[in-house]
Amino acid sequence: MLITIVAAAAMAGAMGQMPRAETVVRPLTYVSLEPVPRGRNFEVAVVAEIQPGFHINANKVLEDYLIPTTVEPDLPNGIRLTEASYPKPLLKKFEFSEQKMAVYEGSVTIRLKLSAQPDAPLGETKIPVTLRYQACNDTACLPPVRKNLPVILQIAPAGTTAQAVNPEIFKKK
């Protein structure tokens, strides 16, 4: 009987324990070219691995009160954003919402299409990127999170041969 009570208490404690919001999503960044020649287009991908049992809101939320997932680059001189591309969300119903919600689960790739301008400074270039999300499980949401992610690339003179890198991330669809 004592073992049953201890086991039940341990399970209740584990079920009620929510992880820290910062630990639910593990993001990594990838660049499509190495180096990036001046005048060339390239991509940066933010791949977010979402802990099982959790989801994050899509970029286009269906209710005004929801916090959308966003990727915001702080572009240095000579780099321009041409497009941000978010994946198609899942539509799911949860206990805490009367309506279906647009969410991401599992692994999510957000792509930024960028251009290295003809006057982009040569050498190492850092593009700070901020991932903003709110993670939830079926019954509750954690506080919103902003994660600063480093993207480091090399800008080369125009005409330099660029090598496509990270093909598993940037494969054509």
Regions found by a protein language model. Give the residues of each.
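Extracellular/lumen-exposed scaffold segments
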Residues: 13-173
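Bacterial N-terminal signal peptides
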Residues: 1-13
